[in-house]
Amino acid sequence: MSQTILSTETIKVKAEARSKEEAIKAAGTLLVEKGYVEPNYVDKMFERETVTSTYLGNYLAIPHGTEEAKEQVIHSGMSVLVFDDPVDWDGQEVRVVIGIAGKGTEHLDILSKIAITFSEEENVERLLSLESAQEVLAFLGEVNE
């Protein structure tokens, strides 16, 4: 993973979304704007969500494309949206949405690092208290290693 996975340009603190769909679109749009994925990757994120929910627990959802969507991934990357107001994710409250695009099997490494971080409730609380994209990048920066 030579390219940066996460940058302040793909992090939004105090993000707003009225629905799960708006949140997925926002996460996907950040990946497109940064050049990580082709625009139709966002459609594949929605397709994945219809197959299985990307809600993981602890206020976290990790929308990502289907297996077929790998063709639309230019570089592995991640977008992070932190919401003050919870987003209804099929009846679950989500406050952090992490959009993921992985080249080859790199998404598995990214997912593993995120899962470890979010398995600790105090880490989730800390992330929710951060005020800037720079602070979020410092907190989640290990995904770039």
From Swiss-Prot:
A family per Pfam: PTS_EIIA_2
Main localization, broad class: cytoplasm
PROSITE patterns: PTS_EIIA_TYPE_2 (PS51094), PTS_EIIA_TYPE_2_HIS (PS00372)
Cellular localization per UniProt: Cytoplasm
Stored Gene3D superfamilies: Mannitol-specific EII, Chain A (3.40.930.10)
Catalytic residues of the enzyme: 64 (tele-phosphohistidine intermediate)
Domain of life of the organism encoding this protein: Bacteria
Keyword Kinase annotated: yes
Cellular component terms (Gene Ontology): cytoplasm; plasma membrane
Family annotation (InterPro entries): PTrfase/Anion_transptr, PTS_EIIA_type-2_dom, Sugar_PTS
Residue numbers carrying Phosphohistidine: 64
Function: The phosphoenolpyruvate-dependent sugar phosphotransferase system (sugar PTS), a major carbohydrate active transport system, catalyzes the phosphorylation of incoming sugar substrates concomitantly with their translocation across the cell membrane. The enzyme II CmtAB PTS system is involved in D-mannitol transport.
Protein name stated in the entry: Mannitol-specific phosphotransferase enzyme IIA component
Source organism per UniProt: Halalkalibacterium halodurans (strain ATCC BAA-125 / DSM 18197 / FERM 7344 / JCM 9153 / C-125)
